[in-house]
């Protein structure tokens, strides 16, 4: 169950515009939250996977021993403090926009109070929460090597397909994201409105394919096989 939900969420991250659209951000957040909940919340036996390792006490303690859990929790709490203590307020008029200072607690982290649809601290909180919930859920919920490999292959295939679409868009002179959605930024790539987001994602895909390559290469060497899945990478 964790493998399916987490894998679909990872694969979908290649195609739903990097969370720039509101519906895509909330879709990724829902998938990440569900992955995490399926990993740590108690589940009935019939819904607990073949190995019965989901939603038990050992998973919860495994989460507490994961350094990224505490790092992410600290960062999310920091962002919550910022969001709850705005030092500047965004103002708009027909002539443009500006910021005005507002009363705030000076010794606490602060932020700019803006529109959630555009960008503010709460939207940043949603983005970081989405990422950490998915990482926590996969770390706790994926216990078998076969499941981990399948998850990595899903990510690699989806990301590679997105990269190929980006290349085709570039050479075909596409003027819209995925040939259908207009973007205020003309320098989009694949399904990403901004190239810096695409680069970050493609670096993740490159690292994933490298891990898969060396894993399958070493396995082929140990078993004396002349080929293997690594040749596809």
Give the location of each predicted region.
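Transmembrane signal-anchor hairpin modules in multi-pass inner-membrane enzymes, especially those
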Residues: 1-157, 178, 209-233
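Hydrophobic alpha-helical segments characteristic of transmembrane helices
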Residues: 155-166
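Conserved donor-binding loop and adjoining core beta-sheet/short helix segment
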Residues: 172
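Membrane-interface segments at transmembrane-helix junctions in multi-pass inner-membrane proteins
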Residues: 162, 175-214
């Amino acid at each position: 169950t964790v493998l399916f939900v987490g894998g679909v969420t990872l694969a979908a991250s290649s195609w739903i515009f990097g969370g720039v659209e509101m519906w895509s951000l909330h879709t990724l957040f829902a998938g990440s939250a569900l992955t995490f909940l399926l990993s740590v919340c108690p589940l009935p036996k019939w819904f607990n996977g073949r190995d019965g390792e989901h939603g038990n006490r050992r998973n919860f303690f495994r989460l507490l021993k994961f350094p990224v859990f505490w790092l992410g929790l600290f960062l999310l709490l920091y962002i919550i403090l910022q969001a709850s203590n705005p030092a500047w307020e965004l103002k708009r008029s027909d002539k443009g926009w500006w910021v005005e200072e507002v009363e705030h607690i000076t010794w606490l982290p602060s932020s700019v109070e803006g529109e959630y649809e555009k960008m503010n601290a709460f939207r940043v909180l949603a983005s970081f929460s989405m990422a950490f919930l998915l990482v926590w859920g996969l770390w706790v919920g994926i216990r078998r090597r076969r499941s981990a490999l399948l998850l990595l292959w899903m990510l690699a295939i989806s990301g590679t397909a997105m990269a190929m679409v980006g290349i085709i868009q570039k050479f075909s002179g596409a003027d819209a994201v995925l040939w259908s959605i207009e973007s205020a930024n003309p320098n989009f790539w694949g399904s990403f409105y901004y190239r810096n987001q695409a680069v970050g994602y493609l670096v993740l895909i490159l690292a994933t394919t490298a891990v898969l390559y060396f894993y399958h290469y070493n396995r082929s060497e140990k078993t004396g096989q002349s080929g293997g899945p690594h040749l596809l990478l």
